[in-house]
């Protein structure tokens, strides 16, 4: 009789995805981030669920309820710190996962890649609405500034903003609906993750040399299940260290002050993981232009597969393209730094140069160098 895990309708799905999945034998630790993102999502949903049991989404009590969680709920401080810093680890893993995809040409699995970009946008939306919930100064003003960007949409902009706010300013209606969204979106993300995996398993994983690996596949379990487990231990250790020793390292001090519509903080800025996009938004001295640049900074990932010109898949054997990739990484770091700086000389011009370079690398330089490298190979 065949094994139950191979015949049972439900277990068969899990078996084909986690046990008997044929996997390239040479995938490196850069392939660990998919499972780490799954772990992040599960940990965020669990800690978030317990926080939601004690949180109240009303402007008069939201800030106090978060303080109550940290002071009076059993291990509430720990749950909150894990949830807040878990978001940072989520984005660290996301950026490394995307960087891996760009470096090794994984984006040529177009459906998987595009669902991945949609997942990225969903996680960004989730993090944004979540940041509003503690109802501190940066929560309130961040919500005001970012939702206000929609007023740049021609003709319907103002109506759109008031519709999202549920009134004429960020108020109780806004907080209540943002809590509803923040509870809902992670489950949408989980659903989209299933699709992401479904499409990935149609083709199988890519690998560091970018060649077809059908001739050399090994079962996912035990080899990669244990490799993933090591990644889990490392990440959970790092998350625990951050949450226990430096819980407020990545937060904004302004968020310890309850929201006050009458007092604007000196520097309104998002969490560190949105700073690169915020820098691109601010580098254009026009509202609609800035909003379009902000959207494009993420959606540009969708055109990467279309602009792939090289005959080789990854950058493993392409030194010039490798240089461009690391320039992109450096550029992202510069943009992240600029996003947290005030709008004054020399930060304005640095941000504008970095923004132009960011789009040039994706849309011009990479396709050009890919084409050039093909010519060199022929020569």
Curated annotation (Swiss-Prot):
Cellular-component GO terms for this entry: mitochondrial inner membrane; respiratory chain complex III
PROSITE patterns: CYTB_CTER (PS51003), CYTB_NTER (PS51002)
Any Gene Ontology biological process: mitochondrial electron transport, ubiquinol to cytochrome c
Keywords of the record: Electron transport, Heme, Iron, Membrane, Metal-binding, Mitochondrion, Mitochondrion inner membrane, Respiratory chain, Transmembrane, Transmembrane helix, Transport, Ubiquinone
Record's cofactor remark: Binds 2 heme b groups non-covalently.
Binding site for a ubiquinone: 201
Subcellular location(s) of the protein: Mitochondrion inner membrane
Binding residues annotated for heme b b562, in chain numbering: 83, 182
Bilayer-crossing regions: 33-53, 77-98, 113-133, 178-198, 226-246, 288-308, 320-340, 347-367
Binding site for heme b b566: 97, 196
Mode of membrane association: Multi-pass membrane protein
One Pfam match: Cytochrom_B_C
GO molecular function, one term: metal ion binding
Cofactor(s), by name: heme b
SUPFAM superfamilies: a domain/subunit of cytochrome bc1 complex (Ubiquinol-cytochrome c reductase) (SSF81648), Transmembrane di-heme cytochromes (SSF81342)
Domain of life: Eukaryota
Function: Component of the ubiquinol-cytochrome c reductase complex (complex III or cytochrome b-c1 complex) that is part of the mitochondrial respiratory chain. The b-c1 complex mediates electron transfer from ubiquinol to cytochrome c. Contributes to the generation of a proton gradient across the mitochondrial membrane that is then used for ATP synthesis.
Additional free-text comment from the UniProt record: Heme 1 (or BL or b562) is low-potential and absorbs at about 562 nm, and heme 2 (or BH or b566) is high-potential and absorbs at about 566 nm.
Assembly information from the UniProt record: The cytochrome bc1 complex contains 3 respiratory subunits (MT-CYB, CYC1 and UQCRFS1), 2 core proteins (UQCRC1 and UQCRC2) and probably 6 low-molecular weight proteins.
Family: Belongs to the cytochrome b family.
Protein name per Swiss-Prot or TrEMBL: Cytochrome b
